[in-house]
């Protein structure tokens, strides 16, 4: 099992380089991803041990902020967020390896994107370890274009169909349900794919699906960035982007499993919260004008079949 974990780690660290390099090619000022490598000390007082590399870009003309973060951590006991629905895992040691990214563009016409790919092994130090993969990618537009959402979902479906014809509809529905703000009765964006507890096939089959899915993120996102990054925008557009970013913050702090897991397990706070946007705003009881550009997004962030 250790060999398989290391193989996935090697894939993720190379993917991190591929993604940051591809994104930098679209940046028009001197902003670059900087590497912040870290290691948790192996001491008795540390609940979580391990290491990682958070790559951050800030202040770009295209990407106002972005993080592509790799981590490999282990602990003696899974936190409550990981065992709430799987009581048989309570008290087990674990290893978790993953890559998580969030890209916050400066231009309100370029959507925010998020992706995450991970493996968990519970009881890795036993004769019967339990493994599963999780991950996916989702898109959060502020001023949506239907063709962008169709391209995003078509890319997702193409990858899913290559491995299992049932995956896209199942993981698309899961994504719509997961990225939902209950207190707002809103979805976070137009969705994509979300899956967890993936071990329904052999390890190699699951590994191949997850790595193909991860490799398709750039195919899904880069064409959208290229198409929208030079659209002119006003302060009104920017203000609405900041307002909608507030929903992103609310979801990450209240509902996101990765954030909750990281904080409950004693993870590295700076890396866990690095996905937050550089700026966001809240307006009391604000509503967009009827039939305005700003009202349009509320029709797009409802679950729908993007692929006819």
UniProtKB/Swiss-Prot annotation:
It comes from Francisella tularensis subsp. novicida (strain U112). Residues 248-283 are annotated as: Important for dimerization. NCBIfam families: PRK05330.1 (NF003727). InterPro entries: Coprogen_oxidase_aer, Coprogen_oxidase_aer_sf, Coprogen_oxidase_CS. GO terms for biological process: protoporphyrinogen IX biosynthetic process. Involved in the heme biosynthesis. Catalyzes the aerobic oxidative decarboxylation of propionate groups of rings A and B of coproporphyrinogen-III to yield the vinyl groups in protoporphyrinogen-IX. The record marks 183 as: Important for dimerization. This is Oxygen-dependent coproporphyrinogen-III oxidase. Coiled coil: none annotated. Substrate binds at residues 100, 116-118, 266-268. The keyword Metal-binding applies. Gene3D superfamilies: Coproporphyrinogen III oxidase, aerobic. Belongs to the aerobic coproporphyrinogen-III oxidase family.
């Amino acid at each position: 099992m250790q060999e398989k974990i290391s193989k996935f780690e090697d894939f993720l660290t190379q993917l991190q380089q591929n993604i940051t390099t591809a994104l930098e090619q679209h940046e028009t000022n001197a902003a670059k991803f900087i590497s912040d490598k870290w290691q948790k000390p192996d001491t008795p007082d540390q609940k979580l041990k391990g290491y990682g590399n958070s790559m951050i870009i800030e202040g770009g003309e295209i990407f106002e902020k972005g993080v592509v973060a790799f981590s490999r951590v282990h602990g003696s006991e899974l936190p409550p967020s990981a065992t709430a629905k799987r009581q048989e895992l309570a008290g087990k040691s674990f290893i978790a390896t993953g890559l998580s990214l969030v890209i916050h563009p400066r231009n309100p016409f370029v959507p925010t994107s998020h992706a995450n790919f991970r493996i968990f092994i519970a009881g890795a130090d036993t004769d019967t370890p339990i493994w599963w993969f999780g991950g996916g990618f989702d898109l959060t537009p502020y001023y949506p274009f239907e063709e962008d959402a169709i391209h995003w979902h078509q890319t997702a479906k193409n990858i899913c169909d290559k491995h299992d014809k049932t995956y896209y509809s199942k993981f698309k529905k899961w994504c719509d349900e997961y990225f939902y703000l209950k207190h707002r009765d809103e979805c976070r964006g137009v969705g994509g794919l979300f899956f967890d507890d993936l071990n329904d096939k052999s390890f190699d089959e699951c590994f191949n699906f997850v790595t193909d899915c991860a490799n398709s993120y750039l195919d899904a996102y880069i064409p959208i960035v290229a198409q929208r990054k030079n659209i002119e925008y006003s302060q009104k557009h920017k203000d609405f982007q900041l307002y909608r970013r507030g929903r992103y913050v609310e979801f990450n702090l209240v509902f996101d499993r990765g954030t909750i897991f990281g904080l409950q397990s004693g993870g590295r706070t700076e890396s866990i919260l690095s996905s937050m946007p550089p700026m966001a705003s809240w307006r009391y009881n604000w509503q967009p004008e009827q039939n305005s550009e700003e009202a349009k997004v509320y029709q797009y962030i409802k679950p729908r079949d993007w692929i006819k």
